[in-house]
């Protein structure tokens, strides 16, 4: 009986050591992958896998499900495409920044020297602020600020090289969507860019599955903005469409735009 128990304990101990070894190998691999990204020139492109490696190292605190969403966001959203469009060493306002994943990745990739993220969710901002503390040791010269603020209460003062509005408008009531869009545009400095992405409203089955996603995670019935409407709002505001892309990840459809503010307003 004693020999049997001893053998059982030894098997459990060996299994625990193997699991610990795999965890250490996985962690070291993630650290090395992220360090490779940090060491690259800012002009170098990143992959979706790079986004996952960065997220796993930066977002290590908070609820397990929240960490899971951050670690795997790159599987359903073209974050690397957004990063590729942002110039090196810019300052950015991220409206509806959530947990700060985009700002974190831009910072590690050398695309951001100063970032201000705002979101109406205090829990999301708490996660972003925790990430900012970790980023401070990785990229010490970056200035990051995350603030809990409702869009209806107004945006931070000042102008920025880049203003990002990513997956926000479909959460805004239809009667306030155009105002929120144009208000964010007012924070783009002359010659700067307005980086916009939202979920597609067609085909119907992609739009429907996107809607089910938000019903499950945000408990919200979302309201799509046709990309044609966003293009019209931007051009009426004096911006030009510099980049127009459509992307799919799994069943998720994404419409991406870069709207450029002229150096000299008409």
Model-derived regions: residue spans:
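Class I SAM-dependent methyltransferase Rossmann-like catalytic core
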Residues: 56-76
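Conserved alpha-helix/loop element of class I SAM-dependent methyltransferases that forms part
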Residues: 72-89
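Conserved SAM-binding loop of SAM-dependent methyltransferases across substrates and taxa
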Residues: 99-111
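Conserved SAM/SAH-binding beta-strand->alpha-helix loop
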Residues: 121-123
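Conserved SAM-binding strand-loop segment of SAM-dependent methyltransferases
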Residues: 138-152
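A conserved beta-strand element that flanks and buttresses the S-adenosyl-L-methionine
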Residues: 164
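A short, conserved alpha-helix within the catalytic core of class I
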Residues: 172-183
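C-terminal alpha-helical "lid/dimerization" subdomain adjacent to the S-adenosyl-L-methionine
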Residues: 196-237, 243-251
